[in-house]
A protein has these predicted regions:
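Hydrophobic alpha-helical segments typical of transmembrane helices
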Residues: 2, 24-27, 68, 109, ...
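Glycine/serine-rich anion-binding loops at beta->alpha junctions
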Residues: 41-46, 92-102
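Glycine-rich beta-strand-to-loop/alpha-helix junction loops that act as flexible
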Residues: 21, 96-97, 155
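Rossmann-like NAD(P)(H) cofactor-binding subdomain of soluble oxidoreductases
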Residues: 1-55, 59
Length: 192
């Protein structure tokens, strides 16, 4: 396995940063006794420097090592530190798996556009740019997502009609809660 080969490289002052999904600090510590370990969960937008990584250190990590880990992880985007490792399953479900949810939104928006009569290539471009632009607006704006949504919604307008469907009791929120719960449950299963 990988642990013996990593263990051979560790010594005093060595910092191990793990991005192995589902591998807890306890698992890592068992294979690397005494090592300073940071468990991290990045996401795929890290590939363009726009990811978010959530990290949790073990007790052996000192302040200088935490700063080094932060600098390393920050090269791929934002970094959030947590003290409670039990949150990592929910983190994995929200930000680790989250890009797939956004990509699925673009896919389904595109298909809905085709169903509404748009040519496939136009629907795909409109969906891609709408999702990308909205994400960038959310990123740059000081306003939260709810306020941005409200700002684009005219009373009794077209957006309001669509949101009535998406925000119904069986709409997007309960669906997303079930999806995130399923991903968190699977993360716990993978951890053993």
């Amino acid at each position: 396995g990988v642990m013996p080969s990593v263990a051979a490289l560790t010594g005093a002052g060595t910092l191990v940063v793990s991005i192995m999904a589902g591998k807890t600090l306890g698992f890592l510590e068992a294979g690397l006794p005494g090592a300073a370990i940071v468990r991290a969960m990045p996401n795929t937008p890290a590939a363009i420097g726009r990811g978010i990584t959530v990290a949790v250190p073990n007790a052996a990590v000192n302040a200088e090592q935490k700063q080094r880990a932060h600098a390393l992880l920050a090269a791929s985007g934002a970094v959030e530190w947590i003290a409670d490792e039990s949150l990592m399953d929910a983190v994995t479900a929200v930000s680790g798996s989250g890009p797939a949810y956004v990509f699925l939104l673009a896919e389904t928006l595109s298909r809905a556009g085709v169903a509404a009569g748009l040519p496939e290539d136009l629907a795909a471009r409109l969906a891609r740019e709408t999702v990308a632009g909205s994400g960038e607006l959310l990123h740059r704006s000081p306003l939260d997502a709810a306020t941005l949504r409200q700002n684009v919604t005219s009373p009794a307008g077209t957006t309001a009609a669509a949101l009535d469907v998406l925000m119904a009791s069986d709409g997007l929120e309960p669906l997303m809660r079930r999806a995130v719960a399923a991903a968190a449950r699977r993360s716990r299963e993978l951890a053993g």
